A protein has these predicted regions:
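C-terminal motif of bacterial Sec signal peptides marking the signal peptidase cleavage site
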Residues: 17-20
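Long, internal low-complexity/basic segments
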Residues: 22-25, 32, 43-46, 53, ...
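Active-site-proximal cap/lid insertion segments
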Residues: 35, 39-43, 58-59, 173-200, ...
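A short aromatic-rich beta-strand->coil structural motif
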Residues: 48, 54, 133, 145, ...
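Active-site segment of extracytoplasmic enzymes that catalyze sulfate/phosphate-ester chemistry
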Residues: 50-51, 58-141, 152, 174-175, ...
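Short, solvent-exposed turn/loop segments enriched in Gly/Ser/Thr/Pro and often Arg
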Residues: 57, 63-64, 76-99, 106, ...
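Non-catalytic, well-ordered alpha-helical segments in soluble enzyme domains
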Residues: 130-139, 205, 209, 299, ...
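C-terminal cap/loop subdomain of S1 sulfatases and analogous C-terminal strand-loop tails that border
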Residues: 164-176, 322-328, 355, 367-370, ...
Length: 549
């Protein structure tokens, strides 16, 4: 559980009284109430601008000067991962704060187990961070990409599927090419053509800035999500950027064009040919070019916040729905794996109480964004969410999370799906994975497994699952089973608790017993009162320690 800042939840949680050797203390209720009083005294809740991009790998941040400046100005999460490295399942998780096994959105289309119509059909659109903030008095707006299969309608017949939780919106469906799309603007559909000013990222940037200007002028706290379709395939940059970086190549990292040792069967036949490498280099150049307009959008939004006088009271959050691989592990362009290329994405936050240049090492996930936004806004977040607020982490707090879950459903190629219909990269079969800071464990439904020691093998090249003990494997399988069934913040956090080794348990219990004996001796000394110490009498030995089972 996170320390320092508590998310408001519908159901109360029981707080365990820990032994003297337990985790750092949380602040008192009065200190939290003091923070809330300070916000109230200022007369304004903080605003939030959330920039969610599509398929952006961490290696693209290097080409985004505004985002790099945000890293210097605020907090960067060094171990932030998505729960599914595919667009729609990840976005469903971001909206709801729940793992894919709880949203049941596991693919991009209704035909295969996901998409907008399933999201809406399960009433998940009524239960998101947008509805939380709207209920807390926020003015909300979303621009760009919503969910796969969402349709805006046509100018003559606008869609009646207005997104719940959003006061304003400007949403497209087929915006991947950047031009020639319909945009549903608050129920009115406008067609944008192929003129330079019709480039989708620029259009949503302008509309977002206009929203900020109006909301700030009216003194309303606001949540704005800007969700460009880039750098997703087909990687179309703004015309002003299309001739830049002519000599750039996809990064030749240690795993580039290298086959994994003891790779699972779905990877065995992969090979990078000369033409494929050349094609990927061009694709990488295009991806970099598409990020330039995103970076400019963020710079323009920051300028508008300053002009509107609300920059000092606004959080800006930058992230991606998933990552992307280009040549690593001898795989051609794609995603959906459990490798870091696909599941580790940027999360950068600036705002009123975010110290400059903070690097957060604790594990974070896209299940956490809903709770984080609720925390910042003082909104009520349901206890049924799986995530927890990340806000305490940039102020020196910690969490006790040890692992994160990654889920994936292997899919048949669907020509209507932008993530499978145009893919040539192999799609992994069904798997579930545990991501730790120091290792990665993947279990496929066909029985194959992978285990990578990230301390000695940071590029995830040597699958050593055959070298770990049977006991360790059973422990990993039990952990994986537990977290795949978890629901709610408490369960999903503590389902991750890995048993310590027997020797570690014995040492910890000896320390706990010694502390208890010391407290008991103090309580029975002549100078002590007749009432036993609560720490010694009511706390069982080993309280708060992991089970050895």
């Amino acid at each position: 559980m996170l320390k320092k800042r508590a998310v408001t939840v519908v159901a109360g949680l029981t707080v365990a009284v820990l032994a003297a050797c337990s985790a750092p203390q949380t602040p008192s209720v009065s200190s939290v109430e003091g923070d809330q009083a300070a916000v109230a005294a200022s007369g304004s809740k903080p605003n939030i601008v959330f920039v969610l991009v599509d398929d952006l790998a961490t290696n693209l941040v290097e080409y985004m000067p505004t985002v790099k400046a945000m890293q210097d100005e605020g907090a960067s999460f060094e171990n932030y991962f998505v729960s599914n490295s595919l667009c729609c399942p990840s976005r469903a998780t971001i909206f709801t704060g729940r793992y894919p096994h709880n949203t049941e959105i596991i693919t991009n289309t209704a035909a295969t187990g996901g998409g907008y119509y399933m999201f809406k059909g399960r009433a998940l659109d009524q239960d998101t961070f947008a509805t939380d903030l709207q209920a807390a008095g926020y003015r909300t707006a979303m621009m760009g990409k919503y969910m796969n299969e969402y349709q805006p309608g046509s100018p003559k017949k606008p869609s009646a599927n207005n997104p719940a939780g959003w006061d304003e919106w400007a949403l497209a469906a087929s915006g991947y090419a950047g031009f020639n799309y319909n945009l549903n603007q608050n129920g009115e559909v406008v067609h944008y053509g192929r003129a330079e000013q019709d480039y989708l990222t620029d259009v949503i940037s302008e509309r977002g800035q206009d929203f900020i200007k109006r909301a700030a002028a009216e003194g309303e706290p606001f949540m704005l999500e800007l969700a460009p379709f880039t750098p997703h395939k087909p990687y179309v940059p703004a015309p002003r950027h299309e001739n830049l970086y002519k000599d750039l190549k996809a990064p030749r990292v240690a795993s580039y064009d290298k086959k994994n040792k003891n790779a699972p069967s779905w990877m065995a036949s992969q090979k990078l040919t000369g033409p494929r490498k050349k094609k990927m280099d061009e694709q990488f150049r295009q991806r970099v070019r598409t990020t330039l307009s995103i970076d400019e959008m963020i710079a323009d939004v920051k300028a508008q916040l300053r002009e509107s006088g609300v920059a000092d009271n606004t959080y800006i959050v930058f992230s991606s729905d998933n990552g992307y691989h280009m040549g690593e592990h001898s795989l051609i362009s794609g995603k959906m794996t459990a490798f870091s290329t696909d599941i580790q994405v940027p999360l950068v936050v600036t705002g009123p109480d975010v110290p400059a240049g903070v690097k957060v090492e604790d594990l974070g996930s896209n299940i956490d964004l809903r709770s984080t936004f609720g925390d910042l806004a003082g909104a009520t977040v349901p206890a049924s969410v799986d995530g927890q607020s990340l806000a305490p982490l940039w102020s020196g707090g910690t969490n006790d999370r040890q692992h994160l879950l990654v889920e994936h459903k292997g899919m048949e190629v669907d020509k209507m799906d932008p993530d499978t219909g145009i893919f040539r990269s192999p799609i992994p079969p069904n798997y579930a994975a545990l991501r730790h800071r120091d290792w990665l464990y993947v279990k496929y439904n066909n029985g194959q497994r992978e285990y990578y020691d990230l301390t000695s093998d940071p590029y995830e090249m040597n699958n050593i699952v055959g070298k770990i003990t049977k006991k360790r494997l059973l422990t990993l399988d039990r952990l994986l089973k537990d977290v795949r069934q978890c629901a709610g913040q408490e369960q999903c956090t503590h389902a991750h608790a890995e048993p310590a080794s027997v020797s570690e348990l014995r040492q910890a219990r000896r320390r706990a017993k010694a502390k208890a004996d010391e407290l008991l001796e103090e309580s029975t000394s002549p100078s002590a009162t007749a009432t036993p110490s609560p720490s010694a009498s009511s706390t069982p030995l080993g309280a708060g320690l992991p089970s050895a089972n």
